[in-house]
């Protein structure tokens, strides 16, 4: 199956680099593409290693809609992003820039979707995901959109509401009971709630600032508040993070849940 992942990002340079690295580490053997829709007026370029023939990364620097107006919501950004999805894409998934994804995220999700599809479902998600927060890492039941694998035609049909924080509800609610929630599904999404200093042993590695967009979808200023904080543009070149650092993030999850 051909999987198309969408990452909307704006002024969270180190988050985007980490999420990009998670995509490059995916072990999926089928076609898979990551669209990075950078909606900041500060353009980014990308520094990629040689990629296998089945793995693709697209960088879209676009901060305005079709009317040349600055995007006013995350939903509007996603509605433009899905216009880039090719006709041969089977599944659409969401690759939030501040979250992380185990190397088997796509492989496991596609396997689950294929089984669900046989029963007439249009989307698949495991019941649990990892929840990474200041107190550690836990397994939680959730409706987190990045854990859902959705038939591409359904996302294109239903689209997103032009809102922030609840923009996914249009397709999520539209699918209703066509989403198969797998109680035995492998948790592969690492959902971050806040970030901060990263240490490897006693060595300080980096600080990743994240500013959450959720929690107040009814406030029309929420999106402007988010953009006001998201001003981390780095060197304006998205570069994968070091292998040992992404391995340390993965080990943090695995060690606390074995």
Please provide the spans of the model-predicted regions.
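Short, acidic, metal-binding catalytic loop of nucleotide-sugar glycosyltransferases
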Residues: 21-31
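Active-site nucleotide-sugar/metal-binding loop of Leloir-type enzymes
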Residues: 75-91
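Short beta-strand-to-loop element that shapes/binds the nucleotide-sugar donor at the catalytic cleft/hinge
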Residues: 122-137
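C-terminal catalytic/acceptor-binding lobe
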Residues: 18, 162-258
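Short beta-strand/loop segment that forms part of the nucleotide-sugar
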Residues: 31-41, 60-64
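Acidic donor-binding/catalytic loop of UDP-sugar-dependent glycosyltransferases
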Residues: 99-112
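Active-site beta-to-alpha loop of glycosyltransferases that engages the nucleotide-sugar donor
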Residues: 7-18, 28, 39-41
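Short beta-strand-to-loop acidic/aromatic patch adjacent to the donor-nucleotide binding site
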Residues: 89-100
């Amino acid at each position: 199956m051909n999987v198309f992942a969408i990452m909307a990002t704006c002024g969270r340079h180190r988050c985007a680099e980490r999420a990009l690295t998670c995509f490059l580490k995916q072990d999926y053997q089928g076609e898979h593409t990551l669209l990075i829709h950078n909606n900041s007026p500060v353009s980014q370029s990308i520094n990629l290693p040689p990629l296998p023939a089945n793995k693709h990364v697209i960088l879209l620097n676009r901060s305005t809609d079709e009317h040349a107006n600055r995007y006013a919501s995350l939903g509007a950004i996603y509605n433009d992003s899905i216009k880039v999805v090719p006709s041969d894409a089977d599944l659409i998934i969401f690759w939030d820039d501040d979250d992380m994804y185990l190397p088997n995220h796509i492989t496991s999700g596609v396997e689950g979707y294929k089984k669900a599809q046989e029963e007439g479902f249009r989307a698949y998600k495991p019941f649990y995901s990892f929840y990474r927060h200041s107190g550690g890492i836990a397994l939680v039941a959730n409706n987190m959109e990045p854990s859902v694998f959705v038939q591409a035609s359904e996302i294109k049909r239903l689209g997103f509401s032009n809102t922030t924080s609840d923009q996914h509800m249009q397709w999520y609610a539209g699918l209703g009971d066509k989403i198969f929630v797998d109680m035995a599904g492998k948790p592969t999404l690492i959902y971050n709630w806040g970030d901060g200093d990263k240490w490897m042993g006693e060595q300080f590695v980096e600080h990743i600032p994240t500013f959450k967009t959720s929690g107040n979808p009814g406030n029309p200023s929420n999106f402007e508040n988010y953009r006001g904080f998201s001003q981390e543009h780095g060197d304006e070149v998205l570069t994968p993070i070091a292998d040992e650092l992404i391995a340390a993030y993965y080990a943090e999850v695995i060690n606390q849940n074995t």
